[in-house]
Amino acid sequence: MRLHSLLFACGAALLLTACDESPKDTWHGYAEGNYVRVAPIGGGIVEKVAVKRGDLVKRGDLLFKLETTSEEADLESAEAGLTEAKTTLREAELEYQRKVKLRAQHNVAQAEVDTAHARRDRAGAAVLTAASAITQAKWRLARREGRAPADAIIQDVMFREGEFANPNQPVVSMLPPQNIKVRFFVPEAELGNIKEGGKVLLTCSGCPQNLSGTIRFLSTEVKFTPPVIYSDQSKEKLVYMAEATLDETPRTLHPGQPVTVSLLPRPAD
């Protein structure tokens, strides 16, 4: 009876050990995201927050808007200046044409025609200057808005309406799907099995089957196994960090999620 129990215990121990070991060319890792943080160029009071955590946004969508009282006043003033400049130009053009006709009748000196011509040119230049002022005012007004630079998922909103955001201080953090990658760790003895550009199979909870990726980076710096994938079998292993981008990014894959990475065989020539 004791012999039977001993054999059973030994068999169970061997089975547990075998199950805990990773198959050849299979490594452990996790998903990681490169977040995009959208900040205003100039500081100001946050007037509107148009998104919340978890929202899906398209490129160009409004994320937030700062108070624009001063910028709107500048634009209104610039538009009024353009209207006035155009009126002055019309009057200067009419006066110039009148002087030209009078000169043709020998009723005015050429100097008066030249003066009217110069006045018309100055008025034309003033219109261009006023139009440029409007362009600048609209540009400053647009800088008070934060818009999505790409399709993404909103990860965090750092400010509420009414709070003051400093220049270049992020208001919204977002994660474009293409910015998700998988970081994994390869034992020193298996380093020769992978290379940049190689294809891998990615397995994770809730992810679709046959999810593939491409190895984009392989570190040249060796380190001990990170705590995030620490186990009794790997605690003494020296590993190299590698990163793979996903050929297709499922919405079920999130930063920090454990991922098993397996090397895919190279296609036959």
Protein language model features and the residues they cover:
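Sec-dependent bacterial lipoprotein signal peptides
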Residues: 1-17
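N-terminal beta-strand block that forms a small beta-sandwich/beta-barrel module immediately after a flexible targeting
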Residues: 15-50
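Amphipathic alpha-helical coiled-coil/rod segments that serve as protein-protein coupling scaffolds
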Residues: 24, 50, 56-153, 158-161
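Surface-exposed patches in structured soluble domains
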Residues: 30-31, 46-50, 56-59, 140, ...
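Exposed loop and linker-edge segments at protein-protein interfaces
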Residues: 50, 56, 68, 158, ...
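Short, surface-exposed secondary-structure boundary micro-motifs
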Residues: 62, 68-69, 113, 170, ...
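Surface-exposed connector loops and short turns at secondary-structure junctions
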Residues: 128, 184-212, 234-261
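Short, solvent-exposed secondary-structure boundary/capping segments
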Residues: 221-232
